[in-house]
Each structure stands twice: as structure tokens, then as C-alpha cells.
């Protein structure tokens, strides 16, 4: 009996992997679009002070925390898949050149690439942790 239990435990992955579905992840995608495209638009309309606040507060602090939190919640509820972190990074990548003003085009392009990679890493790690937590809670 104990050998059968060991075999069944080996077949189950540590991190449950699921298929990506737009229907199940639409709330996360809509929240990300609001966070990365609508909220920055309000700060851009506020003038120079709003843009400075947007650059310092949103780009470096609030956006990575939002990405990590939404990835964690998604991982707990849906499990892990590779497509969700990629969608989060793509949605964020589009907003950086649109709302964040930089002095030179090269600086803007480099910041866009770096922040896209950072957001993808945050989302990937949070989704993996969320899926692991999901697995622990179901045991």
C-alpha cells in the first residue's frame, strides 16, 4: 500500500500547471489595462507634477507591486501557466513609451526593455508562488 502511495505522489507535479484561458483571466487583464493605461493618463493630465509623481511612484514602486499581487492571486486561483506573465509584460510594455517621458529615445527604449523584463520576472515568480500556495492549500 505504501508503494502505491509513493508512486501516486511522484506523478503529481509540485506546481500545478493549467491551460491559459482568456475567459478565466479577463478580470486580471482588465485590471492591468486600467492600472497601466487609464491611471497614468490621469497623472499625465495633471501636468509636470503629475508626470514626476507618475515616473517615481508608479513606474518603480506601484506597478511592480501590482504585477506581483495580481500574479499571486492568479496563481492561487488558476494555477501556473507561461502565457499569463507574458501577457502582463506585453500590456505593461506598451504603456511605458506612451506615458513616461524620457529625455532621449535610446533611454526610453532601454527603460522599456528593462521594465518589461522586470515586470515579466515579477509576474512569473508571483504566479509560481501562487500556484505553489494553491497546491499547499489543497493538501
Map each language-model feature to its residues:
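N-terminal juxtamembrane cytosolic/stromal segments of multi-pass membrane proteins
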Residues: 1-24
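Membrane-helix boundary elements
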Residues: 21-54
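Alpha-helical transmembrane segments of polytopic membrane proteins
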Residues: 53-67, 112-124
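Canonical alpha-helical transmembrane segments
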Residues: 62-81
